[in-house]
Swiss-Prot record:
Zn(2+) binds at residues 114, 118, 124. GO terms for molecular function: metalloendopeptidase activity; RNA endonuclease activity; zinc ion binding. This is Endoribonuclease YbeY. GO terms for cellular component: cytoplasm. Single strand-specific metallo-endoribonuclease involved in late-stage 70S ribosome quality control and in maturation of the 3' terminus of the 16S rRNA. It comes from Pectobacterium carotovorum subsp. carotovorum (strain PC1). Belongs to the endoribonuclease YbeY family. It is found in: Cytoplasm. It holds the Pfam family YbeY. InterPro entries: MetalPrtase_cat_dom_sf_prd, YbeY, YbeY_CS.
């Protein structure tokens, strides 16, 4: 039986209205068990200032972003279930949900799925990688009862 260990950190000044820990756990469990038996992930919910600072430091982009993924890379001789950290910006997730005409819950779920796939080594820099990752995200989201997260883009509602 697979196991997903979640360390949830709320660093947002307003914790009201955030998804519950069980929601984050469920979203991780929708992704990770198909890739490895035991997984440990830290999810840190932050405000725009921290997101902007981290995005600028690690990606050279001076603006907040929806999710940052920091994969853990253990030395080859050390086997640990730690996948890494997801840093998710509450305000950006809520703003994007409104812009993309999604429920906030749906977009939170998508950001957890998207970030988890980055922790597993998926990327979307090249078009072919993006297509593979987006197809996998869609499959996972639909398996959890959510709509295709890229439907708005496909329908021309967003960039």
């Amino acid at each position: 039986m697979s196991q997903v260990i979640l360390d949830l950190q709320i660093a947002s000044e307003q914790a009201q209205g955030l998804p519950e820990e069980k929601d984050f756990q469920r979203w991780l469990e929708g992704v990770l068990p198909q890739f490895q038996e035991v997984s440990e992930v830290t999810i840190r919910i932050v405000d725009e200032a921290e997101s902007r600072d981290l995005n600028n430091t690690y990606r050279g982009k001076d603006k907040p972003t929806n999710v940052l993924s920091f994969p853990f890379e253990a030395p080859p001789e050390v086997e640990l279930p730690l996948l890494g950290d997801l840093i998710i910006c509450r305000q950006v997730v809520e703003q994007e949900a409104a812009e993309q005409e999604k429920t906030v819950e749906e977009h939170w779920a998508h950001m957890v799925v998207h970030g988890s796939l980055h922790l597993l080594g998926y990327d979307h820099i090249e078009d072919s990688e993006a297509e593979e990752m987006e197809a996998l995200e869609t499959e996972i989201m639909q398996s959890m009862g959510y709509a295709d997260p890229y439907l708005a883009e496909k329908d021309g509602l967003t960039e």
